[in-house]
């Protein structure tokens, strides 16, 4: 009994330290966020419901909205991958990648070759991976291999021999940032089934987006705050801003607001955003996802919307 009590107490202390560190890093990042008050006023004039949503993200999650950003949507993982490879090959200054799953195969081998080559060229190449998501798929000497290739690497929340509550905190992000003004995100991990080079459940349908412009700054700050939490290495964040390496004007595709969620507070930002979009819908709701895992609140919300119509 004493052993289990020790595990529970030690695990709780570890989790509390994790939460404190994550909260501090998250709050410290806010000073680098630009004010979006003028853009919020513009959105308010265009759409009250969009304004409520954007204001919630800005005030609660802390991520501002931007204008000067082009967006490209990829309906399939293989489309996203082809463009990702192209942009990685164009990197001149830095590459930041943060993913939940990495599996050896054609997709990862292609990306790794580019990362290694770019590191040799002097590009700052960094990788964050979730230790749980990758534990069954990468070799035990993965970190050593990456460092030998010149790639800086950090494992999110490494799995220990003793279970504690902190092990439930996982990093499900899928983010790539290239030279500060090119960003990729979506549902695509670095594994062959996501680009249909390997079939586990038939044709895999997942989506991704590419951003080019000012809004990539939110993705950069998400990565850097996690990097600081995992490594203790504090960067000069301003040296990674979108304007640093791209002096041409950014093309605007309307208002863009990348956001992040965190396990260290009681606010379920991601879920609230989706529920709010469903609740505010007037004509239709289209949902596409390879994983339909929903709770009772998420089930009831579409039902209420159907009844309302």
Locations of the language-model features?
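Histidine- and/or cysteine-centered catalytic micro-motif in compact active-site loops
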Residues: 263, 290-291
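Helical hairpin unit composed of two closely spaced alpha helices linked by a short loop
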Residues: 291-309
């Amino acid at each position: 009994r004493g052993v289990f009590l020790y595990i529970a107490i030690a695990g709780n202390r570890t989790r509390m330290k994790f939460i404190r560190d994550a909260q501090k890093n998250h709050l410290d990042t806010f000073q680098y966020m630009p004010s979006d008050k003028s853009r919020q006023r513009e959105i308010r004039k265009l759409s009250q419901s969009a304004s409520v949503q954007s204001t919630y993200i800005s005030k609660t999650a802390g991520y501002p909205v931007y204008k000067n950003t082009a967006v490209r949507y990829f309906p399939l993982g293989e489309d996203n991958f082809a463009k990702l490879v192209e942009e990685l090959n164009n990197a001149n200054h830095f590459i930041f990648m943060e993913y939940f799953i990495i599996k050896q195969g054609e997709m990862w081998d292609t990306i790794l070759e580019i990362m290694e080559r770019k590191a040799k060229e002097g590009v700052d190449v960094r990788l964050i991976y979730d230790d749980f998501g990758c534990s069954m798929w990468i070799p035990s000497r993965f970190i050593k291999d990456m460092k030998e290739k010149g790639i800086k690497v950090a494992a999110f929340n490494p799995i220990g021999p003793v279970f504690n509550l902190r092990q439930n905190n996982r990093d499900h992000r899928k983010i790539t940032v290239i030279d500060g003004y090119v960003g990729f995100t979506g549902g695509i991990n670095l594994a062959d089934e996501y680009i249909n080079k390997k079939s586990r459940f038939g044709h895999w349908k997942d989506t991704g987006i590419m951003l080019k412009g000012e809004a990539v700054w939110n993705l950069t700050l998400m990565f850097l705050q996690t990097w600081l939490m995992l490594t203790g290495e504090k960067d000069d964040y301003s040296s990674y801003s979108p304007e640093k390496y791209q002096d041409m004007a950014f093309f605007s595709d309307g208002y863009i607001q990348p956001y992040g969620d965190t396990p260290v507070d009681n606010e379920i930002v991601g879920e609230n955003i989706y529920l709010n979009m469903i609740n505010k819908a007037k004509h239709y709701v289209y949902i596409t996802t390879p994983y339909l895992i929903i709770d009772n609140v998420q089930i009831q919300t579409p039902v209420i919307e159907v009844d309302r119509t």
